[in-house]
Each structure stands twice: as structure tokens, then as C-alpha cells.
Amino acid sequence: MLEVSGLVKRFGGFTAVNNVSFKVGLGEILGLIGPNGSGKSTIFNLLSGTLAPTAGSIRFHGREIAGRPPHQIINQGIGRTFQIPRPFRRLSLFDNVALAGYYGQGRHSHVRAYEAAERALELVGLPVDRDAPVTGLGAAGLKKLELAKALATGPSLLLADESLGGLDEAEMVQAAEMLRRIRTQLGLTIIWVEHILGVLMRVVDRVMVLDHGEKISEGLPAEVAADPRVIEVYLGTEADAVQAAARR
């Protein structure tokens, strides 16, 4: 479904992503992990069209999409959530999601956007009431809203950016299970960036690890957890958490 080859992104003299290549298969959940500053967000920005690569190829369903603007990427079928939700607080929950649906997959139809919003809100467990306000949503509700907006665009590939941030332990488990359930219900492919490794490693099919902009490991969770390079990057407690989660 997605094939990335030799991806490079430089900002002046700083190389944020250096010769990264990977593939994601249909229906797969790929976990993308690494320390702060390892290049995870930059790769998401390159995949979603927020940034253009310095070099390299991004092919989606066989089509080259590197350097295309975000609205074209969305219309190709790639949806994205953001780590920090920023809803339009003067709009209702429903209208926030319908607005995203309007631009997804070239709909440009109020009726189709409303239908997409209803489906997305039902999938994440938020009220479909057209007048329900955004104000008053807690961290878990805002994360659900962010996911609903991405789903309303009708993606076949979902880029999930730190879906567990700010949640308590029970909410983390629920959010992870929701991603797995939605993958099954919609036949989605998911790339999931996350820092909460203990939860992520129990859900994903494969893991890719970045450090200083380079891919240092890729494989099944148990394989990655045993990789000496990964253990070196995640010193101490985090390395133990990675290995423990991969054994479950």
C-alpha cells in the first residue's frame, strides 16, 4: 500500500530524516517509535504533505505523492490525527467533523460530509447530536474528536499521532482498543506514532524505530524489543517496558 524509499529531509544544515525506507502492507498497524527529536513527526509531516522531502520517494497505491499539498494527500486517502487537538470551539462537535468530511476524498457535498460525520462520530463513541458543544470535552473526548475528524475524510491509511497523550491508564487501553477495532471494521491501514510503548507494543503488527533521523530497527515487536540498538536508545526503564510489552 505505502512504499517509502530513501526519504531525506533537511532544514538548512540539519538533517531531520536521513535515507529512511519502509513499506506498510494493507490492513497493517505499524508502530513508529523513537526518542524525542528522532524524526517521527517529520516523517508524518512528509507523508501528509505538510512538508516536501529534500530527496526520496513516497508511493501510495503505486502513485508518487511526495511533495503534494495536504488537500491532495487527503483526497488520495491518507488521513491524519494530531498530537495536540485544536478543534474549532465555536462549532459543534458535529460541524467540526463534518468540515473534515467535506474535504475528504473530493466529496465537496454537504450531504455526503454529514453522512461521513455521523459514521465517524458513531465509530469513536461521541454524540451525533448536531448541537453538542466541543467545550467541556476532556482529554479522552478531544482525542476521540481528533480521530473522528480523520476518519470522516474517508482514509484507507490513517496516520495516528500520539493518540494516548494526556490519557489515564484506563483511557489509554480504551483508545488503543478503539484503533484496533476501527482497523478491523473499516479495513484501515495505520501508522501509529506513540511514546506509551507498553500499550503500543501490544497492538501493532510491526514496529519501526528511529534515532537521530535514521531507521535503526524494524520488525515484529518481540524482535525489535530484543535489538541491542533499541535497548541502547531506550536505556533503563523504557527498554524494560518495551521488552515486557512485547512478551505479552
Stretches with model-predicted labels:
Residues 1-248:
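Glycine-rich phosphate-binding loops of nucleotide-dependent enzymes
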